């Protein structure tokens, strides 16, 4: 058939794992040597992670933030399961790791990239890390991506100080943060971390009612006004 690999990526492929497993089984009946890739945000149970390790050939694992407030503000979920799973994957599935990845979101998580790198290095300094630029989308459609200079600065600092042996970075997306978002972030009291406040401001302006961004327990989770289909319509 001329296919040597198949990859499952975002949204988050692990929520469809039973169907993915079935698809992989059918593919391997025709192509026993086909490679199977996963690109994941890392938020899953250990049981699911173990199944992913058994099923796939390689994994790209993304850590969006190191600070819990920042991770909640960006994703609506705590960071602890992600860090736990990152460590488990490194210790128990090192041969499956294609790369760890983090995106640079200016003013939100860009001061945490080195923390993420040091966390990975503390487990295994040979794990590759890819640092890529945020591109405005979804709830952060109007938030700027990093400049080329900022990407270069972060990449060099991480490469020099984190202890990781394999760090790559590249890309940029220059814009500016709107005054309305900055003013909203200043008014928020439910989070103390400045990056978390900035990320939460976008959700609040889109209609999010949660002060802690715990989406799993939110009464509006099935009809959330911040679950934007057309984020460019936000008046920011």
Language model features by range: what are they?
Residues 1-143:
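Conserved AdoMet/S-adenosylmethionine-binding subsite of the radical SAM
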Residues 110-236:
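Auxiliary Fe-S-binding modules of radical SAM enzymes
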